[in-house]
């Protein structure tokens, strides 16, 4: 349940769907397996293993999951069969095979193999935090996060969500914190960061498991590099990497949160319920504190 990486989107809290409405809409876009000549299939699936429901509600949070199944048909397999067929035609009919005919043969081979191809599946989860008005997506890759947002919009007939656009850039804030050797409020420097310079060939410096206040680290900023990723700890509850795109990576929920969830969950459902609430509340509160140090949202 605990998301290890997060992209998030501010939502219009006045226009969020109720759990039953969301479930009904997602049922119309439920996942089905690839059929026949389909290369892939995508749809919503149960977010928890102990329930078939497409929405898992926990207090002010709603959890959903998008599943994608893709056919695996290696290009090398198609190429080998195509070469065999071309050689067979050349030997049996004593003629060359042109580009157009090769393309037609390739398409025929693909159509023959596709129904029997192996599949691989992936899923992206998201939690609506209706109290704070955030959609938290368990993926820091923009393409994956945008995809589940798009699918939710399609299923709901619209969803007012925006990119997290603050008055000050995360990179500027992180660079300032590293330069001054400390953070503001409930944040502390951890032990990892990434810095980038400028120029035709952009120099990149990655620092891992080091004291970020050390002179050799700070000197990179003084030499003109900016921080693009920074390891932070928030109120002794969450350790994470903040990126210049305002995504969170390598999230670790420290013992205090894990223990609180375990004390409130007697079984799988209870633990999932408690973990979902604690994760959504702590992460959203942390994000709001970050937004305040970034000058608030752009108008």
Curated annotation (Swiss-Prot):
Keywords: Cytoplasm, DNA recombination. Its main location: cytoplasm. It comes from the Bacteria. GO terms for biological process: DNA recombination. GO terms for cellular component: cytoplasm; nucleoid. Disulfide bonds: none annotated. InterPro entries: RdgC (IPR007476). Signal peptide: none annotated. It holds the Pfam family RdgC. It is found in: Cytoplasm, Nucleoid. May be involved in recombination. Belongs to the RdgC family. This is Recombination-associated protein RdgC.
């Amino acid at each position: 349940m605990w998301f290890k990486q997060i992209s998030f989107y501010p939502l219009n809290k006045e226009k969020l769907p109720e759990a039953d409405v969301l479930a009904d809409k997602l049922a119309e876009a439920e996942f089905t397996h690839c059929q026949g000549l389909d290369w892939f299939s995508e749809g919503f699936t149960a977010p928890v293993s102990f329930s078939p429901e497409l929405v898992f509600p926990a207090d002010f949070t709603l959890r959903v999951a998008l599943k994608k199944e893709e056919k695996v048909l290696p290009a090398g397999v198609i190429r080998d069969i195509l070469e065999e067929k071309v050689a067979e035609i050349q030997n049996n009919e004593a003629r060359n095979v042109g580009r157009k005919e090769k393309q037609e043969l390739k398409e025929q081979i693909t159509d023959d193999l596709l129904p029997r191809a192996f599949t691989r599946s992936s899923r992206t989860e998201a939690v609506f935090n209706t109290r704070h008005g955030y959609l938290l997506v368990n993926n820091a890759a923009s393409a994956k996060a945008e995809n589940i947002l798009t699918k939710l919009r399609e299923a709901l007939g619209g969803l007012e969500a925006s990119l997290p656009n603050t008055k000050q850039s995360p990179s500027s804030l992180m660079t300032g914190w590293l330069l001054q050797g400390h953070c503001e409020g409930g944040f502390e420097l951890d032990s990892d960061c990434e810095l980038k310079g400028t120029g035709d060939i952009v120099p990149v410096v990655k620092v891992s498991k080091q004291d970020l206040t050390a002179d050799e680290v700070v000197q990179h900023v003084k030499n003109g590099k900016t921080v693009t990723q920074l390891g932070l700890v928030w109120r002794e509850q969450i350790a994470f990497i903040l990126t210049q795109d305002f995504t969170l990576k390598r999230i670790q929920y420290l013992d205090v949160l894990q223990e609180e969830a375990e004390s409130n969950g007697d079984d799988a459902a209870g633990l999932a319920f408690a973990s979902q609430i604690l994760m959504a509340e702590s992460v959203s509160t942390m994000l709001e504190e970050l937004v305040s140090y970034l000058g608030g949202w752009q108008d």
